[in-house]
């Protein structure tokens, strides 16, 4: 059993390392958007970009639609879902009839998923500090202090780890369909809602990145249409 666990962790760690291309694209695109944010004053929307939004606050104030934050979450979704997808097959994953193998498989996923979540959160801490330092001038009314930023990062870390671990644990004792439903309910009910529903939409898609990309694009489009139909004339893209 111990050798099996070590082997699974090594395999999942190797899969995690193979995400470097997506990580580079993700980090690079976020930094480019940050530079664009620095070039344009967006007032209160900057606070939404840094602290994130909940589903409820998005629906109530779609004019404060944080484009950079949504792209941030889509990037995280691509990385995390693809990490799971690479090893979710009927031959090697939770469809194994042998329960001990299935248990160790998901233990490895929980461990490596936590490492991935921590790495992304560290990057986002640095990224948010960059935005705050760029807007430290008195010309901008950014009502964010260090306590608010710390609380935001703690929720971000807990939210990322919990949504991943919840899916793994439910799938261990049930199956992926139940895990997907539980994760969706977890987000919609707003327990630590830092992520919209599309964060866990791709768990059902294990047939390739194209299918997941289509699913994500459709759900992001739905959120955009909600914002557009409610307050399209008040949406703030790059300027007040």
Feature-to-residue mapping (PLM):
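N-terminal hydrophobic signal/anchor transmembrane helix of membrane proteins
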Residues: 25, 121-126, 224-230
């Amino acid at each position: 059993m111990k050798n099996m666990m070590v082997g699974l962790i090594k395999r999942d760690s190797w899969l995690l390392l193979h995400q470097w291309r997506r990580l580079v694209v993700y980090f690079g695109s976020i930094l480019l958007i940050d530079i664009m944010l620095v070039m344009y004053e967006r007032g209160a929307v900057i606070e939404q970009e840094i602290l994130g939004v909940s589903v409820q606050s998005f629906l109530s104030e779609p004019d404060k639609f944080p484009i950079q934050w949504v792209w941030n979450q889509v990037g995280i979704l691509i990385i995390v879902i693809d990490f799971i997808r690479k090893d979710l097959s009927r031959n090697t994953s939770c469809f194994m009839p042998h329960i001990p193998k299935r248990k160790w498989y998901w233990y490895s996923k929980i461990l490596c998923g936590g490492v991935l979540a921590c790495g992304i959160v560290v990057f986002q801490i640095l990224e948010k500090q960059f935005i705050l330092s760029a807007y430290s001038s008195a010309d901008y009314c950014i009502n964010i202090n260090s306590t608010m930023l710390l609380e935001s990062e703690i929720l971000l870390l807990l939210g990322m780890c919990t949504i991943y671990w919840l899916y793994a644990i439910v799938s261990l004792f049930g199956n992926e369909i139940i895990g997907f439903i539980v994760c969706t309910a977890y987000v919609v009910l707003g327990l630590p809602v830092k992520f919209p529903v599309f964060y866990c939409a791709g768990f059902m898609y294990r047939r390739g990145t194209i299918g997941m990309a289509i699913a994500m694009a459709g759900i992001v489009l739905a959120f955009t249409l909600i914002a557009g139909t409610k307050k399209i004339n008040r949406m703030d893209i790059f300027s007040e």
